[in-house]
Regions:
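Short beta-strand scaffold segments in enzyme catalytic cores
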Residues: 24-32, 109
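Charged, amphipathic alpha-helical segments
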Residues: 4-9, 91-95
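Zn2+-dependent cytidine deaminase-like catalytic core
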Residues: 40-134
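Small-residue (primarily alanine) positions within well-ordered alpha-helices
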Residues: 11, 29-30, 59, 63
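Basic/polar N-terminal segments that are highly enriched at the extreme N-terminus
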Residues: 1-5, 136-138
Length: 138
């Protein structure tokens, strides 16, 4: 079983792989699939900014490519120069990607330090969200 603490540790490890020459912010994420598999992601920046991808989406897209569709938790960490200075919440685009594949009770661990984190849910960070079922055809 992957504990929240292990997920946090894997997010911190992923942050070390970030490519962030433009913003100066390194971000790492560790995504827990329902079957216990963990996917790590980091932010990867680009000079034109639009093709930049966040750590959370990197982890999700790797997992989705490998066939996973059910997720239980994600740990996210980040900070200027790769130094954690407090919780680093996901951007709006990443929250909407989470909504596409996760239920309200999906756990979101925002890392505050090497050994501390804040536990939230998707419902906490994305209330009144636009859900995939609103697009579904009968």
């Amino acid at each position: 079983m992957v504990t929240p603490e292990k997920l946090v540790s894997l997010a911190l490890e992923a942050m070390d792989r970030a490519y962030y020459p433009y913003s100066g912010y390194a971000v790492g994420a560790a995504l827990l699939c329902a079957d216990g598999t963990v996917y790590q992601g980091c932010n990867i920046e680009n000079a034109s900014f639009t093709p930049t991808i966040c750590a959370e989406r990197t982890a999700f897209f790797k997992a989705i490519y490998d066939g996973h569709r059910e997720f239980t938790a994600i740990a996210i960490c980040g900070g200027k120069g790769g130094k954690i200075a407090g919780a680093f919440p996901p951007c709006g685009v990443c929250r909407q990607v989470m909504r596409e594949f996760c239920e309200d009770d999906f756990k979101v661990y925002l890392v505050n330090g090497k050994e501390s984190y804040e536990e939230l849910t998707l419902a906490d960070i994305l209330p009144h969200s636009f859900r995939p079922r609103e697009h579904m055809q009968d």
